[in-house]
A protein has these predicted regions:
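Sec-dependent signal peptide recognition
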Residues: 13-21
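Intrinsic disorder/low-complexity segments
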Residues: 10-13, 28
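Hydrophobic h-region of N-terminal signal peptides that target proteins for export
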Residues: 22-31
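Short intrinsically disordered, low-complexity coil segments enriched in acidic
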Residues: 1-3, 26
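Intrinsically disordered, low-complexity segments enriched in serine/proline and basic residues
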Residues: 3-6, 10-11
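Buried hydrophobic residues that stabilize the cores of well-folded domains
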Residues: 31-254
Length: 254
């Protein structure tokens, strides 16, 4: 489950760490401009060890919501079911596949009503386009995507059909820190909307992503088990000179 956000996801989180011209060596999956989730790997490829549950706690350690995951026989994620801090149902997201490729993602509220639908189009095994529709089927956003056959997104541009706004991104390796890559987010006039710095360890695992937007700064930290599986990830916001813990996600494996 991504954060801080609703189950639908926020626009400016993360995406595949690749520039337009240089293919980098660290595989991060993602299909929406500016969005990343550890679950993307469960949609595009078969992962040996996948979690069956994710527990989210606030800065005080209280459980705020839980996500439970269901997979098909190929190991692909097919259902993500949410419950609130009291254990009551809070909607779900379902995923469908055609010939092993992700074809749609549907978000439902607690009453079972469709809130949002995403349709995916591929060329071969490379994701090329994604259409976002509301619960009534109205087309809201069209994403043009450059990706490879592994689900890794290189570049993308989103066009909002209602506001007529466009948003895109580009990547650049930090020349002083080769294990750090910078994502620049821009609008249709190439005005900077912010940037995100990604830090990797020597094994190629993403361990930190830091967000810069004006005076605002946030950090997302990821922790791994000895076998390389994601153990937990946490979100922090800077207030003055201090970093404040917002929430922590703990993954549960059977």
């Amino acid at each position: 489950m991504n954060s801080p956000m609703s189950p639908v996801g926020e626009l400016f989180s993360m995406i595949r760490i690749i520039s337009f011209l240089i293919i980098l060596s660290f595989p991060i999956l993602g299909y929406t401009p500016g969005k990343w989730s550890h679950k993307d790997a469960y949609l595009f490829k078969k992962v040996k060890k996948v979690p069956n549950k994710e527990i989210v706690r606030n800065g005080e350690g209280q459980v705020v919501y839980v996500a439970e995951y269901e997979y098909n026989s190929d190991g692909k994620l097919i259902t993500e079911t949410y419950s609130d801090k009291e254990g009551k149902g809070d909607g779900k997201t379902t995923f469908r596949y055609t010939d092993g490729l992700l074809s749609s993602e549907e978000v439902y509220d607690n009453g079972g009503h469709l809130v949002e639908r995403k349709d995916f189009q591929f060329k071969g095994r490379a994701l090329k386009k994604m259409n976002v529709k509301d619960g009534e089927g109205r087309l809201l956003i069209v994403y043009s995507i450059e990706s490879d056959g592994e689900g890794n997104v290189f570049a993308a541009e989103g066009k909002n059909l209602e506001t007529k706004d466009n948003e895109s991104f580009r990547f650049q390796i930090d020349p002083k820190h080769p294990n750090v890559q910078i994502q620049y987010l821009t609008d249709d006039k190439k005005k900077g909307l912010g940037e995100i710095h990604f830090k990797f360890d020597t094994k190629g695992n993403l361990v930190e992503r830091e967000f810069f937007q004006g005076e605002n700064r946030r950090v997302h930290k990821l922790k791994y088990k000895a076998d390389g599986s994601l153990e937990s990830h946490s979100f922090h916001v800077k207030q003055g000179d201090n970093w404040i813990l917002e929430k922590t996600h703990v993954l549960v494996y059977e």
